[in-house]
């Protein structure tokens, strides 16, 4: 009974109303007196808060907090997902107002205090639908064998002061949320898409890490400074990728140099035992009403890796700058992004599972050896039917990456020190890191670790909640996409086994549905959890994770974001 707010559809009767909802959240409907409807009508999708749950009553009593709209309407459904997780879908007026009051023009005095990169070649590379440009890269040649690469990050904390109304809202949200068709920004849009966004041909304030690298991408020097930049161009990943592939186009010589350095950084990282999880993202082509017309997959290519490698380098450098202190000295309290070593039992389970596909990994030995054997497994399954599945189970084997003041290193990236510094427009921990960095660069004393740890925990929790909401929004679109395909037959692969049914992922569009166990009526099936399979008592027929199957789409339930399949 910890959760007090629920989303559902209102059923209004003569003297009272009920909130009817998906039972996975609460088994009992919520009783709502008619004077607590807050303008909501019969059939509306609403957010309700439980006010009391009388001792003897079956149903809790609630009141309508917000009317979301009519079920089935795209915005209503997206807001419903956010509301169900307790996430915001509107900006408080006072926060918007505070953002409007921030002056657009950068003070000349401020510019004078900073290192000026406005005449240095600088670009941003981002997804084509992005508006919040957090990061830019600059390049200049220092000598025949030496390059200077600047990683320039939007100086958000110059505009958002600790404890002000914008800051409190951002701290609470902790992250921007990327639903399937919209972004719920952590900061008001005037900041996220305007003042702080590193838009081309505009002077922008940054917090930067400047590297000197030789042609082998060995770092000769690095420094952390406040800067002012003026980006020459905003490229999409697709445009940058075309330049990398063809060697032609605007700024091709600079992009090719940066790409070559990034590739070398990447090779070194994997040689040190970083793990290469390259998952594709499922994306939808939506019409103007938000209806899904088609599914496509977004893959990471060299242009993505180019940005990724320099961001990883900057994050690592900042974490080392604060965390790496001489023996016997105490590092000041800081926010790390940590990723613990996988649990050895989980590695054994993964090993047992992949054995049936003829693969194996090292589960003992030092962490670099284990990581390398996981990489070689991920390489081997590329393009094979079990690819997605083995990757999924391998990811589940890993610990979760979280924020913490207690540094244990980052296993997946093979870094001893790592933090999040490069995305302050969309992640609050990065804003915390910017503030700590500024304080410590100025010689300030350490902040209180206990308080910082609490903020880290809040950010980790919110990151997880946002990820769940993002997943739900994709799930909703998948069900909506399949709703007019009832009766169609598809090839798929068993993606989950439970005692209530078999989950199957369709190969061509990655939509997942379930064959309820009652549909398997040729036998009585029992779950063999250890081996990820269902086994028929009589026939010994089995359904196991990773097995190819043909299914027919039987039902699409949008309200529950569920697809039901039957065997074809």
Q: What are these model-derived regions, one by one?
A:
Residues 1-150, 157-202, 234, 532-534, ...:
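Charge-lined substrate channels and their catalytic hotspots, especially those that engage the 3′ end
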Residues 224, 237-507, 514-516, 521-532, ...:
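Append "with occasional cross-activation on large, charged helical scaffolds in nucleic-acid assemblies
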Residues 15-18, 147-149, 219, 291-293, ...:
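Hydrophobic residues embedded in beta-strands of well-ordered beta-sheets
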Residues 52-55, 70, 156-158, 215-217, ...:
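Conserved nucleotide-binding/hydrolysis micro-motifs of P-loop NTPases
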Residues 176-271:
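Conserved catalytic alpha/beta cores of large enzymes that bind or transform nucleotide phosphates
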Residues 22-25, 34, 52, 153, ...:
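A short beta-strand motif that forms part of the nucleic acid-binding face
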């Amino acid at each position: 009974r910890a959760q007090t707010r629920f989303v559902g559809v209102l059923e209004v009767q003569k003297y009272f109303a009920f909130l009817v909802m998906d039972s996975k959240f609460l088994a009992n409907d919520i009783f709502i007196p008619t004077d607590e409807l807050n303008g909501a009508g019969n059939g509306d999708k609403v957010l309700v808060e439980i006010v009391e749950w009388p001792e003897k009553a079956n149903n809790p009593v609630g009141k309508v907090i917000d009317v979301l709209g009519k079920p089935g309407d795209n915005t209503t459904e997206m807001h419903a997902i956010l509301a169900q997780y307790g996430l915001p879908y509107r900006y408080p007026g006072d926060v918007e107002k505070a953002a409007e009051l921030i002056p657009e023009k950068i003070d000349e005095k401020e510019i004078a205090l900073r290192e000026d990169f406005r005449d240095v070649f600088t670009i941003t590379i981002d997804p084509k639908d992005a508006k919040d440009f957090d990061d830019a890269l600059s390049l200049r040649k220092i000598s025949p064998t030496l390059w200077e690469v600047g990683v320039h990050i939007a100086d958000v904390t110059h505009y958002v002061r600790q404890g002000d109304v914008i800051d409190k809202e951002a701290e609470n949200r902790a992250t921007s949320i990327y639903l399937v068709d919209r972004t719920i920004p952590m900061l008001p849009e005037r900041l996220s898409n305007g003042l702080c966004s590193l838009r081309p041909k505009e002077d922008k304030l940054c917090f930067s890490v400047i590297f000197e690298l030789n042609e082998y991408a060995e770092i000769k020097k690095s420094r952390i400074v406040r800067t002012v930049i003026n980006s020459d161009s905003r490229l999409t990943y697709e445009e940058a990728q075309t330049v990398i592939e063809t060697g032609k186009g605007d700024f091709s010589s600079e992009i090719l140099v940066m790409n070559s350095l990034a590739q070398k950084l990447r090779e070194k990282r994997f040689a040190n035992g970083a793990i290469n999880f390259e998952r594709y993202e499922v994306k939808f082509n939506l019409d103007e009403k938000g209806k899904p017309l088609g599914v496509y997959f977004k893959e990471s290519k060299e242009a993505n890796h180019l940005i990724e490698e320099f961001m990883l380098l900057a994050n690592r450098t900042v974490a080392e700058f604060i965390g790496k202190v001489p023996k016997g000295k105490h590092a000041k309290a800081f926010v790390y992004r940590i990723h613990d070593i996988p649990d050895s039992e989980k590695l054994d389970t993964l090993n047992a599972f992949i054995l049936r596909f003829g693969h194996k990994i090292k589960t003992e030995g030092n962490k670099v050896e284990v990581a390398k054997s996981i990489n070689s497994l991920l390489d081997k399954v590329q393009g094979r039917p079990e690819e997605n599945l083995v990757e999924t189970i391998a990811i589940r084997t890993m610990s979760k990456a979280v924020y913490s003041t207690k540094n244990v290193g980052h296993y997946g990236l093979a870094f001893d020190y790592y933090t999040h510094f490069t995305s302050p427009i969309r992640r609050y921990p990065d804003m915390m890191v910017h503030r700590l960095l500024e304080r410590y660069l100025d010689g300030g004393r350490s902040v209180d670790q206990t308080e910082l740890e609490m903020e880290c925990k809040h950010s980790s929790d919110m990151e997880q909640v946002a990820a769940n909401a993002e997943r739900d929004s994709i799930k909703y679109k998948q069900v909506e996409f399949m709703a007019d395909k009832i009766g169609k037959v598809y090839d798929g692969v068993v993606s989950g086994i439970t005692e209530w049914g078999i989950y199957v992922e369709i190969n061509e569009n990655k939509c997942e549905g379930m064959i309820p166990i009652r549909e398997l009526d040729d036998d009585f099936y029992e779950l063999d959890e250890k081996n990820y399979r269902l086994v028929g008592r009589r026939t010994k027929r089995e359904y196991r994770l990773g097995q190819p199957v043909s299914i027919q789409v039987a039902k699409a339930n949008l309200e529950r974001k569920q697809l039901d399949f039957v065997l074809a």
